[in-house]
């Protein structure tokens, strides 16, 4: 039998959602069946799964240690058969529930990737390579509270993994939380801190992360309702003469991860709106302050390129010969686009 006491970071989520994360090898139907049979209890009582968890709640799971281990660490497929504790007899289900040290940097010699896959399932933790440890030194914690962390992401780092072997800011977040005592490895089974907004790999700047259910919910609400102003700085090709607010429609080609802009609405297109102010301008380059009205993938890069002012260093949407020139002459290895303010 396993007992789990809900912490402040885990409170606010539904009981069944917690169980799905805690026992990723079990189906939702199986977990609901265990709730009905009282093989899983909340505060010593039968529960339905819809209950909102609060700090101090006690969860009791009446599984054998072997069964618990199997459901927590599924190795190959899902298996909903299990051995209950001897006091309960044997059952087989049908399938179906388809702050201290916070400013301290993690010990990079011991740093590991603790995240699994992008959905939080499967995978194995692994040690970081020397190159990954060195690159992580560029990450900075800009702000911390009980529920939220704010990071500076360097250009060249993924926000989230694209494949299992990648390192990312989300991986760094988990490692940072473990190394600084914000959360333990054991607690990751019930709640995983996560970034709330993403930047393109080669864009630097501010990324928000929730380190509690409350924090993640609050950030998600602000981003969804667009109550958070997102501002960027970028250096673009050519002379931009005046401030402007531009609009259009965007489609994305998943195969080559590239967007196209349209003046009129096209099939599958999303409406986008971008505002910019000219901070400084010469005949060859302009420094712009960008405000994202909408927030679609590659919006700034694609939108500015569509009006003749691609971002410096942006090979996907800009001029390759020009970007090669500034790369070798000025050392510009990434697109000069930076998320610098969230208000």
What residue spans do the PLM features occupy?
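Acidic/polar residues at beta-strand termini and the immediately following turn/coil
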Residues: 253-254, 262, 314
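Short, P/G- and charge-enriched loop/turn segments at secondary-structure junctions
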Residues: 127, 137-138, 259-266, 326-331
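Oxyanion-binding "anion nests"
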Residues: 273
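A sequence-level detector of short linear motifs
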Residues: 48, 260-261, 299
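RNA pseudouridine synthases
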Residues: 1-255, 267-270
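Pseudouridine synthase
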Residues: 18, 166-173, 213, 283-342
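Long C-terminal interaction/binding lobes of large macromolecular proteins
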Residues: 276
